[in-house]
Amino acid sequence: MKYYLSLFIQEFEKACKIAIRYKFDTIFNICFWAVLIVIVSHVLSTKHPGNIPIFVNSFMIWLITNNSFIAIVESIMKENTQGTLEQLYLNARSFYSLLTIKGVTASILSIIESMFTLSLCVLFEANVKLSMILQWIYILPLLFIAIFSLIGIGIACASFALRYKNISTFYSMVSAILFGILTYGAILLNKKPILMMLFPFAKANATIQLFFKGKNLINIDTYFIIIINDLIMMILGYVILKYYLKESKKTGSLSKF
């Protein structure tokens, strides 16, 4: 356990240093989404000002899930393209655990960047209140538990790179469309627990949306469904990764990047 905690700290420090080193890209990413939210909010304010908080919170959910998923996939693909994935695989520790830690690190950094985006919106959009940031801080524990479903599906998606090498267009489209649809339809699915367990981040998505509408459904049942969803997605990621690792070993392509 001490080993994994130390590894997580090292990975997080590494991710932060990379974000600072390439600060232009990091700042541009934060500001771009903030500007987009502010522009759409100003358009909405002319006819439906009351819908702005709903829009901002829904967009934040999509932004966190989309960016976290992409960050997870890209962190694994980077090991792939740099030729270091084989070294991780040969590590005496659990290969899947190492990838999971990378996924957790990428997700946390994406959540932090998204919170900076929301903070900028507070400065430039009157209908986005400081209390909204406090509400997001309140639901952070739920977010941190639910991100494991994103990590699982992210590892599953990144596994395709072992076979097809370049999948950037594929995972970008899957991410934008999948999490866009889930954010739009999460509340409709909320009454169907089985479906909530089968779609990544679906229960957390619906719970967060309802929370911002004044319906606090964060309880033991909610956490139970989220944890089951996490386990299903993590197992799915493990199975797909295992399959493509075997295929790569057969063809000898694991070290050929």
Regions picked out by a protein language model, each given a short descriptive name:
Residues 1-30:
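Aromatic- and glycine-rich beta-strand/loop motifs that create alpha-glucan
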Residues 106-164, 223-227:
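Alpha-helical transmembrane segments and their short interhelical loops
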Residues 6-10, 185-224:
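Short hydrophobic, aromatic-rich alpha-helical segments embedded in or entering the lipid bilayer
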Residues 161-198, 202:
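Transmembrane helix segments
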Residues 229-257:
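Junction motif at the cytosolic side of a transmembrane helix
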Residues 53-123:
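Hydrophobic alpha-helical transmembrane segments of multi-pass membrane transport proteins
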Residues 21-46, 55-68, 176-180, 234:
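Hydrophobic alpha-helical transmembrane segments of multi-pass membrane transport/permease proteins
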Residues 10, 14-18, 78, 82, ...:
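Short amphipathic alpha-helical coupling elements at transmembrane boundaries
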